[in-house]
Amino acid sequence: MLFRSTVDLLPLAQEAAENLRAAAEAKNVSIIVSGENAPVIGVRRLLYEIAYNLCDNAIKYNTDGGSVDVRVGAEGGSACLTVRDTGIGIPPEHQSRIFERFYRVDKSHSKASGGTGLGLSFVKHAVAYHHGTIALKSEVGKGTEIAVRFPQEK
């Protein structure tokens, strides 16, 4: 059974980033979390996995010396978690499919970086479970930004 409670996205994002710090350092990628408290009612484990998967992908598909910027905030009745990287980016023709199970943009890169191809599919379903939305912006050679928004209880 999934237990819902009040979960603040800022310390959750900080925890996910800290747990990925060694992976980021191994790729010479900096990861910074900033923002403000943004509480939501949800399943802590699922919300953590959303933050973790987004940060993990931002590190895996980044460039040497790149960066990952994680921002958390509350705006217009929503809590928002945004992960922006300076990585390889996603070609426009693949952007509509990256949240599908097992879908990989570059299968050769995926073998080198590991993973199952389920991370972003999980993110999509966990965000939907929390009645949230996902927005993607990406440019090849410049990086990717994924923003997830969750309704905040009044």
Question: What do the predicted segments below correspond to?
Answer:
Residues 1-3, 35, 39-45:
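Conserved micro-motifs of the catalytic ATP-binding
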Residues 5-18:
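A conserved beta-strand-to-alpha-helix junction within the catalytic ATP-binding
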Residues 23-33:
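Short conserved segments within the C-terminal catalytic ATPase subdomain
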Residues 65-77:
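Short beta-strand/loop element within the Bergerat-fold HATPase_c
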Residues 85:
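Acidic ATP/Mg2+-coordinating residue in the GHKL
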Residues 90-104, 124:
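Short conserved segment of the HATPase_c
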Residues 131-132:
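Conserved glycine-rich
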